[in-house]
């Protein structure tokens, strides 16, 4: 359908959400077994719908139908919970039927990045940050089918880049910044892996398109001046508190960043902003924030991250 394994489009999320809603409604019961497991309703395949497996640019295909009324080859059909799910799938694919492909790539420092079809993530450039050590630039572009040169054969739209996963935040369409988050900074496989996705909408002539890119950042920076983070302790707060200031500093004078490791809160600049406390939470509720400083390759080493924890307590009712 012009998308792919790495797709993060809103319409894909909505489709997955619809499937999950159907699964919950049809499978879950209120019964719980002695060992604490929820009893599931069995699935009767004859109560569902069938739709033919999708083939690119297929001109004739069997119409999706109730199981017993399906006219196509049942051995080459997919099963769906109901009519709504089957028709949602058909509608998604019909959008791209008969349309031409368009292809995406990435430019870094004005040069088109190499594309290797043997790799799982087929574009894997080197991390090339600006002077601050964490900001980098990438530009999504339309290319020919070999991804070796730019092309004008594409939909009348501009490709955009979005985050899939990893320690990164998007600043604008071509600017990104290393930004660690609650996954942590001690995972050998994941801490340094950034994955982004270029996407391009389709039109009447072209299918939509996506292309992923993976960047491995060095973690940690081990060359250069050592640095340490000084992070004062944080006081407990009561429910209803709006925010809490953070005042960590680096002994090398570099700006310190933060992420929430656990608890109902978010980071906005140098502030912890509290979010609604989940129902049935047990008080006091623990919040842990991590201060980090990545350093600058060859000049300043990555600082050891520093954690600080505090508790959200129930607001005391003051007696008059």
Language-model segments: which ranges?
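Alpha/beta-hydrolase-fold serine-hydrolase catalytic core, especially in secreted/extracellular enzymes
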Residues: 2-141
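Solvent-exposed beta-strand/loop surfaces, strongest in extracytoplasmic domains of secreted
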Residues: 100-320
